[in-house]
Curated annotation (Swiss-Prot):
Biased composition (Basic and acidic residues): 22-31, 560-572, 621-632
Region (Disordered) residue spans: 17-44, 351-402, 495-520, 533-581, 605-668
GO cellular component entries: axoneme
Keyword Coiled coil tagged: yes
Compositionally biased residues, Polar residues: 368-380, 546-558, 633-660
Keyword Ligase: no
Keywords associated with the record: Coiled coil
Name of the protein in question: Lebercilin-like protein
Pfam family, one: Lebercilin
Parts forming coiled coils: 148-259, 305-336, 420-440
Biological process per Gene Ontology, one example term: intraciliary transport
């Protein structure tokens, strides 16, 4: 059995014995109260003994608080509670025993007397009480020993805690001391940081003072060294003089004093002369250096001026070269069209006027815009002529012109100043500038003359128009309306051509025109006055206009050409709705006039005079170009198509006195 079971059995036995004792005591008290008092006294004595023992056992712990009474009270309360719980069980057991004792008595011990039973029960009761008391003493002793053990452990823990507290206090003191030291060090460091600028200033002042002392000491050393050198030199000089004097004193073959003084005077005079020469030479050196510096400055200025002049000349040469290149390009462009013009002229002279096919007419239609562009470029490129009221009617043989110009330009460029002599350069430049100014003046005078002549012609034309009758003016207005209609038709034609495309083949261009129905051309008959007005000529004829008979011939020729072109178009089946074509033979003299005007613009009037003198025999055929020029009025300009199919004559606008009388006519 285990210890727990043993303890349970012992406790049960104790409680059962206690219950029996209580029952018996109650019975004995009823029977004999004396014995009850004795038992009470004995129990009280036992209790007192127990308390005395507990006090004796705890006497050694008088210094500390005694917890035995409280512990016993707690144990007694627990025991009483247990007794109250187990009283009914004990009563039932006692009843069973009593019944068993009765049965045994009834069977075998009927002879035993009541006194023996009482003594026997008393001895048993005493023995049980003694056992219970011993057991109580053992339990109390164990509990008290455990309590003492616990108290000792707590005392030991208290002592350990006291030791730990003392150690912690000592550590805290040490840490406080360290903190104070650290605070002092931090305060010193902060103070040192605050005092840093003061310390630095003190240090700098000390360094400055030390440097000043060093300088003073060095200066003193230098002065002392100079004094030493001076003294050394004086000593050497004195030694030399002493040696010389000793030698003189030792010499016995010396001359007389007069001779020596004479020699001294001669030597001194020579020395003075030498000094003067040296001074004069120094002055001459200074003067020569100044003169040389001046000459150098002058030469440098001259070189700078020459360099600037060379730079300007180089820039001018570059500009001239660029202009020459541009003019070469222009001449190349012009030469292309001049060759084409010549080819077209040869073609017109070779084979007769035959009605052109529809494909050729389509080609003429397909490229009107390129011809007009080329005409614009030719008009912009050709310079204005200085001759009286004459304009260029075509561009011919420009290759020969360009070659001659290219031959003459290097000749003029070679005349430019070279970089060898500055004086010649400046003189040449001044001459060239004068020459250019003269050329500009000549050109201005020629232009002014041309302007005056144009103004006079305009005034004459205005006067003649004012003298016209009102009937002729009424005839002009419907013609102006017809010209406006022609312009509108031409603009529509241009738009249609732009839509169809300029790069299409001639067959494609001819297709839309062949489909449409052919339109008969209308024939108009105008008076001479209206025809003259169409061509920009004065309308009035007769004696007042006797000088303008040339223009009447040109109008008749123009009308005949127009009728021939109408017949050609009627044969070919193609009738353009506007314009008229005219072919003009250009002679070689026009080229000469153009060349002379171009050379005059490029190189001045003097060069043109030289060329005129060199070629006097060319003036024979000058009448033919005049006739060709008279065929065109001064307000017209002719140009050929790029492919020579047709020729365009553009009539410039004439501005009369009233703005409504202005007129513009474009003929293809």
């Amino acid at each position: 059995m285990s210890l727990a079971d043993l303890t349970k059995t012992n406790v049960d036995e104790q409680f059962s014995s206690v219950a029996l004792e209580n029952n018996r005591r109650s019975a004995e008290c009823k029977r004999s109260p004396g014995t009850g008092d004795f038992s009470r006294n004995s129990s009280a004595s036992a209790k007192s003994v127990d308390y005395s023992r507990s006090q004796c056992s705890c006497g050694s712990l008088s210094s500390q608080y005694d917890y035995s009474e409280d512990f016993l009270c707690d144990c007694s309360e627990k025991a009483i509670n247990r007794n109250y719980l187990k009283q009914p069980v004990v009563k039932e057991k006692e009843k069973k025993k009593y019944n068993v004792s009765k049965i045994s008595q009834s069977k075998g011990q009927k002879e035993i007397s009541v006194e023996k039973k009482h003594t026997w029960n008393a001895s048993l009761f005493n023995s049980q009480i003694h056992m219970i008391a011993q057991r109580r003493d053992a339990m109390a002793h164990r509990i008290l020993s455990a309590r003492l053990h616990k108290i000792k452990g707590l005392k030991n823990e208290l002592a350990d805690m006291h030791h730990k507290l003392e150690a912690i206090l000592t550590e805290n003191q040490f840490l406080k001391q360290l903190q104070l030291r650290h605070l002092k060090a931090i305060g010193k460091y902060e103070n040192s940081q605050n005092n840093l600028p003061q310390i630095m200033a003190k240090h700098q002042n000390e360094v400055k003072n030390l440097r000043q002392l060093l300088r003073k000491s060095q200066e003193k050393e230098r002065t002392v060294s100079r004094k030493l050198r001076e003294t050394d030199s004086q000593l050497l000089k004195t030694k030399d003089t002493l040696q010389a004097l000793q030698k003189l004193s030792e010499d016995k073959n010396l001359a007389e004093r007069e001779e020596l003084t004479h020699k001294l005077s001669i030597i001194t005079t020579k020395m003075e002369a030498n000094d003067k020469k040296i001074q004069s030479l120094e002055k001459q050196l200074r003067l020569n250096s100044r003169v040389f510096s001046r000459q150098l400055a002058i030469e440098t200025r001259k070189t700078l001026a020459a360099q600037t002049a060379t730079k300007t000349l180089q820039v001018e040469v570059k500009h001239l070269q660029q202009k020459l290149k541009e003019k070469d390009r222009e001449l190349e462009i012009k030469n292309i069209y001049s060759h084409r013009i010549l080819k077209n002229l040869h073609d017109t002279e070779d084979y007769p006027k035959v009605s052109s096919t529809k494909s050729v007419q389509a080609d003429r239609k397909s490229l009107p815009f390129t011809s007009m562009r080329h005409q614009g470029t030719q008009k912009s490129d050709v310079p204005p002529l200085t001759t009286k009221g004459k304009k260029a009617t075509g561009n011919m043989n420009h290759k020969e012109k360009s070659t001659e110009i290219n031959r003459e330009i290097p000749h003029c460029v070679n005349k430019l100043p070279k970089q060898e002599d500055s004086k010649t350069k400046y003189e040449d430049l001044s001459r060239e500038e004068k020459h250019l100014e003269v050329q500009v003046l000549l050109e201005n005078t020629g232009r002014q003359k041309d302007k005056k002549e144009d103004q006079e012609k305009k005034t004459i034309f205005v006067k003649e128009e004012q003298e016209l009758p009102p009937k002729i003016i009424e005839v002009i207005h419907p013609e102006r309306e017809s010209t406006q209609e022609d312009v509108l038709v031409r603009e529509k034609f241009k738009r249609s051509m732009q839509r169809n495309g300029m790069d299409d083949t001639p067959d494609k261009c001819t297709a839309p025109y062949t489909k449409g129905p052919l339109r008969q051309r209308r024939h108009y008959s105008f008076t001479e006055a209206t025809e003259n007005l169409h061509h920009g000529l004065p309308a009035s004829g007769g004696p007042a206009n006797a000088g303008n008979t040339k223009y009447s011939h040109s109008t008749s020729k123009h009308l005949s050409n127009r009728e021939e072109m109408e017949l050609e178009h009627s044969d070919s089946g193609y009738e353009p709705s506007f314009g008229k074509s005219s072919r003009i033979k250009v002679k070689d003299t026009t080229f000469r006039d153009k060349k002379s005007s171009l050379m005059e613009e490029l190189f001045g009037s003097g060069y043109v005079l030289k060329t005129d003198q060199s070629s006097p025999g060319v003036a024979k055929g000058s009448e033919e170009p005049l006739q060709s020029k008279e065929s065109h009025p001064p307000s017209q300009a002719s140009a050929s198509n790029a492919f020579g199919d047709s020729k365009v004559t553009v009539v410039n606008s004439i501005k009369p006195s009233s703005p409504t009388e202005g007129k513009r006519k474009i003929i293809i």
